[in-house]
Amino acid sequence: LWGVDRIHQIHDAMRQMLLDVDKDAHFDAVLVCPHRHRDRCQCRKPMPGMLRLGEQLFRGEAPTQSQLVVEIDGGAKVNWWNDKIEPSHPLDAMIGDRDSDMGAGWAQGVRCFKVNWNLGLASVTERILDQKDKGDPFNPLR
């Protein structure tokens, strides 16, 4: 696991890359799961805890700063056997290059777009903006 200083270095580098492209670019938030895979926390993908926190931050009642540094309550449990839930907004999407990304998106009910790691977001931008595009199929039990 990386320490806090390394996480800040990575995010600072990402910020600079954005600013190099657009001087007005910024992050609205940076959310980090500090746990190891074996910790089985609610915030590490494929669990949707980070997505649920993001939704709370931007669409609900934002938690206080002190609440942000404690364990994330994953909210409703995920039933991988049920049908995918409905998203809060039709343009909500999870874009990623791993099945764990798709699992988190599926558990949150959002459209999922799996991309090649070296193509990234640019390869699906048009699809994301098309509300009729339901995303890529994903079976959480596979």
Language-model-detected regions and their locations in the chain:
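Short, solvent-exposed loop/turn segments at secondary-structure junctions
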Residues: 1-2
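Asp-based, Mg2+/Mn2+-dependent phosphohydrolase catalytic module
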Residues: 5-25, 38-142
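Short, basic/glycine-rich phosphate-binding loops at helix/coil junctions
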Residues: 29-37
